[in-house]
Curated annotation (Swiss-Prot):
A GO term for molecular function: GTP binding
Transport recorded as keyword: no
Enzyme class name: transferase
InterPro entries given in the database record: GTP-dep_dephospho-CoA_kin
The organism of origin for this protein: Methanococcus maripaludis (strain C6 / ATCC BAA-1332)
Name of the featured protein: GTP-dependent dephospho-CoA kinase
Pfam families: DUF359
Segments forming a coiled coil: none
EC number: 2.7.1.237
Family: Belongs to the GTP-dependent DPCK family.
GO biological process, one term: coenzyme A biosynthetic process
Top-rank lineage group of the source organism: Archaea
Nucleotide-binding keyword on record: yes
């Protein structure tokens, strides 16, 4: 399990990619992280390969997503950490060539962008919410994987 600390929290406040109010067209493998982001994609006809959700926004405001996902997985991931269970499930899901999967988080999904970038293949599009700004869209690259590895090394491991 990795625990968030002040140094990494400060780094994570900066978006990893470009922030959009409305996303441009997206091609290839897509992973969405967060309920509002996923709901926006689905309402615009974009079905992510994997959606990571906790059915809340800003930690406690419920979000209704009426979409029926093809395959659903659940893991626990407490606030402020990346659980081993979440890491293993994301690692597994990165190997599946399927669409319309959901990973439902009991806890909080905010930090799970990190293992998604670590384990999903290069050129995967990752979309997550940047609070009060919009959505961040990035393509996984080797350079981004190295940046994520550094963040993981800076986190406390238990």
């Amino acid at each position: 399990m990795y625990l968030l600390n002040d140094k990494v929290a400060h780094e994570l406040k900066k978006p990893f990619g470009k922030v959009y109010k409305e996303l441009p067209s997206i091609e290839g493998k897509v992973v969405s992280i967060g309920d509002v982001t996923t709901k926006h994609l689905l309402s615009n006809g974009i079905i992510p390969d994997l959606s990571i959700l906790d059915f809340k926004t800003k930690r406690n405001i419920p979000v209704d997503i009426p979409h029926k996902f093809k395959t659903i997985f659940e893991v626990e991931n407490p606030q402020g950490c990346i659980s081993d269970e979440a890491i293993e499930r994301i690692k597994y899901l990165s190997t599946i060539h399927d669409r319309d999967m959901a990973l439902i988080i009991k806890g909080e999904e905010d930090l799970l962008t990190i293992p998604v970038i670590k384990y999903f293949p290069e050129d995967t599009s990752v979309i997550y919410g940047q609070p009060d700004e919009g959505m961040v869209l990035l393509k996984i690259t080797d350079e981004l994987k190295q940046k994520i590895e550094k963040l993981l090394n800076d986190m406390e491991e238990r």
